[in-house]
């Protein structure tokens, strides 16, 4: 999957860019 390495806070996968997923840490990855 393609995930830009940009630190983004999230509550759901939809908060993240591209194919990033929301990790347990509360950040996209």
From Swiss-Prot:
Keywords of this entry: Disulfide bond, Knottin, Protease inhibitor, Secreted, Serine protease inhibitor
Site positions for Reactive bond: 5-6
Protein's cellular compartments: Secreted
Location (main, coarse): secreted
Keyword DNA damage appears in the UniProt entry: no
InterPro entries associated with the record: Prot_inh_squash, Proteinase_amylase_inhib_sf
Record GO terms (molecular function): serine-type endopeptidase inhibitor activity
Pfam families associated with the record: Squash
CDD domains referenced in this protein's UniProt entry, alphabetically: PlantTI (cd00150)
Disulfide bridge partners, by residue number: 3-20, 10-22, 16-28
Any one GO CC term of the record: extracellular region
Similarity remark: Belongs to the protease inhibitor I7 (squash-type serine protease inhibitor) family.
Function: Strongly inhibits trypsin, weakly inhibits chymotrypsin.
UniProt note: domains: The presence of a 'disulfide through disulfide knot' structurally defines this protein as a knottin.
The protein's name: Trypsin inhibitor 5
The organism of origin for this protein: Cyclanthera pedata (Achocha)
